[in-house]
Amino acid sequence: MITGIEILKFGVEDRAASNKFLADFGLKNTTSDIEGTDLYQTQNGSKIYIFDCDDARLPQAIESGSTLREVTWGLDNPVQDLADLADHLKDVDGYQSTADMVQCIDPNGMTIRFQKSFVQELPQLKTEGINQYGSINRVNAASPVYEKGQPVAIGHVVFFTPDLEKTEKFYIEKLGFFLSDAYRNRGAFLRCRGKGYHHDLFLLSIPNKPAGLNHVAFVVRDIHEVIGGGLNMNRSEWSTFIGPGRHPISSAYFWYVNSPLGGAFEYYTNDDYLTEEWQPRVEEHRLELFTEWAIEGGLDDHTRRQVKPA
């Protein structure tokens, strides 16, 4: 079974800016096992590689400039899973297989790879509970305040796609993904297994918008880390796309920061957890489904108020 995203490979135009961004974002710089690249990891061990955008080892890009070039998904039963994937994907563009992996190109042009999962569960990473009416989960303890974010895991990726129907069908029929919710003719929220968080992949169709990366999202521990991470990025002089805020469609709290690696990077937490019994909702795309509330441009670390336009 596919378990989630474990490796992202980016081709970038500015290595120095990309390295600073990932360090400020709270990812851990470690010695890369791929020559000529930089490697950062989340707390559970997921990997983000930085290549030069013209590195011949990278797959073809789906858009110009700095962007995501390859997504690797983990498998919890690699022997059976690889055999099943090989059977399902053997007629797909870019198909390759070895004893350890299967790879192809999805209908959106993105290279996707599947291999044995290597990320670690982190049961020791706990946070203080939320006190709500009728449910007391924190006693004689204060909620935490975070100086910066330290992402736990890669949560999901979001791509612009000019052919939503074809790409959605590929992930559901070829890879066994589940539809969680949808914007009619506009977007599909997909999770890679029946029981799991709201989405591992979101496909977004906008008229006349070609294939490209919208954002990459990283799980943090709680809403307080969303805020602490975003404030630190403001303090480190990175611009906010939008956030903090909350998505009603998934219940998640978010903060998106513009990234020199392409698209935006998102801190998020509190997304819905679904099972096979969940019935997908198909809604017309509406602003109030994307944001219950949100702050455009972020919060200023000094004033703790909305960033004022220049």
Map each language-model feature to its residues.
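Glyoxalase I/VOC metalloenzyme domain signal
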Residues: M1-T31, T42-A99, I105-G155, F159-R184, ...
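Minor-groove-contacting beta-hairpin "wing" of winged helix-turn-helix DNA-binding domains
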Residues: G36-Q41, A188-L190
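Conserved blade-ending motifs and adjacent loop-strand segments that build the rim/top face
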Residues: P244-I249
